[in-house]
Amino acid sequence: MADLKVSVVSADNEVWSGLAKQIVARTTEGEIGILPGHEPLLAILAAGEVRVTTLEGAVVTANAADGFLSVEHNTVTIVARNAELVK
């Protein structure tokens, strides 16, 4: 199975990047799950959590608002005006 190359960035810095096996994010259409092989997608983020499951199975959580999520060729880019890792 392929991996997802993920970048989560805010307006002023990169919040997290790496390889993942799953992404779950809240969009204006509802919560969406992204797995390797997902069709191309551009979605508007709603305020809420973005959960990234790494290849090792760890879950990285970030709060994100005011942005978008892009999926193309197993590359997921999440750009938000406000984004920060949840400790």
Report residues per predicted region.
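Compact, glycine-rich, soluble single-domain proteins
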Residues: 5-87
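Extreme N-terminus of proteins, especially the signal/transit-peptide cleavage junction
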Residues: 1-3
